[in-house]
Structure formats: C-alpha cells, structure tokens
Amino acid sequence: MAGVRSPFVVVMGHVDVGKTLLLDKIRGTSVAYREPGMITQHIGMSFVPWQAVEKFSGPLVDRLRLRGRIWIPGFLFIDTPGHAAFSNLRKRGGSVADLAILVVDITSGLEDQGVESLKLIQSRGVPFVIAANKLDRIYGWKSVENRPFLFAVEDQEWHAVATLEERIGKLIEELSKFGIEADRYDRVRDFTKQVPIVPTSAVTGEGIADLLLVLAGVSQRFIPKEKLQVGEGPARGVVMEVKEERGLGVVADAIIYDGRLRKGDVVVTAGLEGPKEAKVRMLIMPKPLEEMRDPEDRFMAVEEVKAAAGVRIVADGLEGVVAGAPLLAVWSLQDLPNARRLVGEEISEIKIESDREGVIVRADTFGTLESTVLFLRQQGVPVRKADVGPPTHKDVVEAVLSRRKNPAFGVILAFNVKIPPDVEKEATSSGIKIIRGEILYRIFDEYLKWSQEVKTKTIEQILSQLTRPGKIQILPGFVFRRSDPVIVGVKVLAGTIKPGVTLVKDGREVGKIMQIQKQGKPVNEAAVGDEVAISIQGDVMVGRQIKEGDVLYVYVPDEQAREWLFKYKQYLRDDEKKALEEFLKTRKSAHQ
C-alpha cells in the first residue's frame, strides 16, 4: 500500500447560497497557512492539508479535543460545486465522494436545488455536514474575520443569538421532513444519528474553522480507513470533464482515486458506444503556487501522478468520452480485455435497454444518468431505457411501445440535454410527452403531475365505457304513456341513470331508457335524488310488466359488474355501490 489519501469533499446547495465563495474561503485558508512545498496543486480540485487546518483553527482544535487525533492528510475539495460534479464522482457500487457539504442560506432555508442536492446525497449514502451560510446577514451579528463560530456566538447580543436560534430551528424542522435529524454541531451528542449544522459566513470567514474541524471529525467517524488506502498499481479513476484545448486536442480532466497513472499508459474509459481505449501522450498538472510567475504559464507536464490526484489527460482516442465514465490504466496489453470488460460491465449497469414497461431517461453524463435512474427507482418509477445524450427517434418508438402497457410510461425524461427539433416533432405527433429540465426533482414532480393527469384521463375513458349502477322508482300518478314507448315520472333512489341503459325488474329486463327530461328539457343523466321523466323502449306496458311504485335497477353486464367490484370500486359513490349490490342480489334471486 502506498498510504492513505485525503477524503474527496463536494460542496452542494441551491444557486446563490455562497458555494463558490465558501470554497474560495476554504482554499484561501490553505494558501495562507501553507508551508513551503506542502501544497500540491490539482486539476479540478484543491488540497487543504490538515496542518493548515490546525494552524487556521487555532485554539478551537483544543476546545474540540482534536489535536493529535486526526489521521487524514487533509481534504481534497472538488473545485466545481453542485450536483453535476457530485453525480459524476461515481464508481461501481457507490460514490467517489467521501464527504459532502450542503450549503444552505440560513436566512431562507432549504430551496429547490438544495432539496435536490440533499436527495442525491441521501441516495448515494455519503456522510455530510450542513453549512448554514450567510451568518453575517443575521440582524445585529458582530463579525470578526475568520473567527470560529463557537467563539463568535459568545460575543453576540442576545437578540442576534435569538434570531440565529430561530433560523436554525426552522432549518431543523425543514430537514425533519426528509427524515433527517439535525442540530447545531456543538449540541450533537450522537453523530451517527444527527447531522451537524455549522453556521458560517463565506464573506467574513466566520465558522470556516468549525466547518473544517467538524468535517475532520465526521470523516474519521464514518469513512473506513480501508476506503482511503491507495495502492501503487495501475490507476483507477473517473472522468470529470471532456473538452477541446487549443494545441492539445481533446483532453479529459480526471480524478485518480487509486494507483498511479503514467505517461505512455493505455487507459480504458467509455463513450456513448461503450468502452474506449486511449494512449496517454501527456499528463498536465498545475505548477506549485510558489512557481506561478505568469498567469498564462500555470501548468506543467509530469511523468506520472499518484492517487489521490486531479489531472488533465492528453491522449489519442478521447473523442466521444463522456463525463462520469470510469477510467482504468492498463500496464500490460494482456490486461486490456479484462479492463474493457470491467468498464463495459460498469457502463451496462448505468445504461438500461429492456422491453419491460417504464419511462425513457436521457441525461448529459454517465454520472447524472446514474443519479437520475437511482432517484426514479427509489421513487418507485420503473425505467425501460436509460442512455446518455439527446433523445432519439428510437426513444420515441420505445416510449410508444411502453405506453401500450401503461399510458403513464409514454414519456421521455430528459435531464440537462437538448431536444433535437425533429425528435420533438415526432414525439408531439406520436403523443409522447418530453419532460426536460436541469433540476432532477422538478422533472420528477412534473412527471408525477403529468402521470396523474394521464391516469385520471385513462380512468375516465375506461369508466365512460362502463355502465354505472342505478336504482329508480316509478312515481305514482306520473304515468304519461303506458306503452310504445312508456313515459313515466321516476325518482332516482340511488346511483345514476343515462339514456341507453337497460332497466330490470326482479332481475329481468324490461326495456331501455330512450330519453331523460328534467323540467321539460332533455338531460344526459340523472343522479340520486333527481325526479325526472323517462321514456322506455321495449316490450313493456305499464300495468303489466311494470306498475306505479315499482323499483327498477340499471342492468350492469356481469363482466362490467366484476370490473366495478374488483378494479374500480373506489370510483363509485356509496349510493352507487348500494345500487350495484342490490341489483346483483336481484339477478341472483331471478336465476335461482
């Protein structure tokens, strides 16, 4: 074993809550308190050594009794905040991210993307800390730059502390709705049951020391040491971004979480069509801070990188590689088939292509695709097909096939991808819904709303084909015509009657309702309590087959009666249920 790496930390939260500013403040502490040659620069992430944290935090380390008890080398903060980076930090069976900071605006609480971030963190099972940011916005709060929160709160007026407590209380209440028990970090007694909330200010730096120390404590409590151990073998990593660089061609920014990557190595990763091979021509890393003289000359080529590292890979064959794809280095050509197999198996677990019923999912990266599918499954939504990239004509066909089994599955959910105009046109003409968005739970909420509308519409269509139960009584003194057709006044005792339904007496058919009139005007139906005139067509005469005062029932065919009883009973009113039960009893008696 080569040793223990630092945990990867991702910062997440709603837009404008101060994620980037918080990251800048954290990075600033490591720069200000670094020792010469201590800080290693990375592509896409920043290393904050534990020694720098100890120096920055000062007496708070002793107050929290952490001095000499922390064995992690430091933290590796992913430079790009947000759920996309978190999603792409994926590996088979879990997340490359070891810790997450959920940044919440203490003045406004959980918001849209904050909720999504929270659900993503929960779905991956990643330990997290909540930074209740914008502490400096609390009315009356007296700020001192970079002061630990525990020291700051002791120096405040009572009304500022009261306002803070009120805001934290509201946040705790909001979090409880998602099954999360939380409290201000210095009040947490059991970190296995409660999530710590650390009040911070990314503007003044207050609470940053507390945040870093709480992260250290959480990492040592929840991250097994074995997970942070790294070897000396071929590198394993994940692609975070693929782009074209002038003079270099297509490059991949990757995070190496185990092993070593060397110039000249063959790497196996993945694109839309499956596993891809590329030969490393150059490995690029940032120059050490003390060597950065010219802003234009910030990078240098290296012969190899060791985990954990963020590196830019220049290689032949990176075209079409997708972010979130695994990356395996191969040191022997004999190992190439096995590496391709491993990458292929991992991608096949993310991409879905089946003939089972379910929705169609499209996303922009392997990471976001995996997160989307995982989220949908947790919400009980089956997936028929899931792939990376914009929706295609084939997706529309698949959605049409899925709709045949369940109308609520005739949909394409598109996360952070553009919809080609020709595909959108075909979807519209085929009656396929495309729901596109950049916030996962918003897409899900829109899908739920749409699927409920589809379900309601489908049920309405089915119910419109079924005969609703009904029970009427011929009113004495209201016989207007005795035969051909019979016209009588009736009262609807239960259920519903409509033109076209057949009436029965004692289980035997007496005729069909031709028309219903209420106060001299034709109506399409009459419900319980209504008194109306009806015309009855059939071999029936008042005084023979029927008479004044008789009770008649709407005839419900046996198959439809079973449908009502075993599938759609909840859509019947109580009086309709009673009418159906009585009708079935009379039918049974008539056939005995």
UniProtKB/Swiss-Prot annotation:
Keywords: GTP-binding, Initiation factor, Nucleotide-binding, Protein biosynthesis
SUPFAM superfamilies: Initiation factor IF2/eIF5b, domain 3, P-loop containing nucleoside triphosphate hydrolases, Translation proteins
Region described as G3: spans on this chain: 79-82
Entry's transmembrane regions: none
Classification lineage: Archaea, Thermoproteota, Thermoprotei, Thermoproteales, Thermoproteaceae
Region (G2), start-end ranges: 38-42
Residue numbers spanned by region G4: 133-136
GO MF, one annotated term: GTPase activity
Family listed: Belongs to the TRAFAC class translation factor GTPase superfamily. Classic translation factor GTPase family. IF-2 subfamily.
Keyword Nucleotide-binding: yes
Name this protein carries in UniProt: Probable translation initiation factor IF-2
Gene designation: infB
Residue segments, region G5: 201-203
UniProt: GTP binding residues: 13-20, 79-83, 133-136
Function recorded in the entry: Function in general translation initiation by promoting the binding of the formylmethionine-tRNA to ribosomes. Seems to function along with eIF-2.
Domain named tr-type G: residues: 4-225
